[in-house]
Amino acid sequence: VYQHEPSTDKNNRFRSDHTLFPIRKNISLEQNRLHVDYHFSDQMKQIFTTEINLAMPSCDGMGGRYVYQGKIPGGFGQLLELNHLTEIILDDDTLGGSVVLRTSSPVTLRAYPHYSVSQSESGFEKIMQAVTLQVECPTPAQGLNITLEINAR
């Protein structure tokens, strides 16, 4: 559980002091980039995982795809796992651009569709609402920076 710390209008700071290994989290917005910085306590030698649920307009349609090292390993509606990743592009035709995920240290990325269920006149429907991105890595001593950058075509 994160507690909010005094912040400025340019960033928000949080801390998790109620755990064995405190984590500090700083969120800032700079032009077209969202930065999230994690700072770990020195004694934390664990695996750190965080989850990003990102609504992409194309969702599981034909216009949404991952681009990794210049290749397309799959679409937003597919399961994806990549190791030693520091950058991946989420390219979306409906968005008319892309979201670039960058990390300061190599991570394991697990991506999968996030579905909801709704009831309509024809019964229950499973609808993809977002892309879930799980970022996992050993806690780096210098901390971890995750950046999401939105780019128009």
Where are the predicted features?
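Beta-strand-rich recognition/accessory modules
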Residues: V1-Q43, H84-R153
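Surface-exposed beta-strand/loop patches in extracellular or lumenal glycoproteins
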Residues: Q46-M56
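Surface-exposed, gly/pro-biased binding rims or lids
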Residues: G70-D91
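Short aromatic-acidic-glycine turn motif
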Residues: L54-Y68
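Residue-level detector of solvent-exposed, low-hydrophobicity positions
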Residues: D9, S28-E30, C59-G63, P73-G75
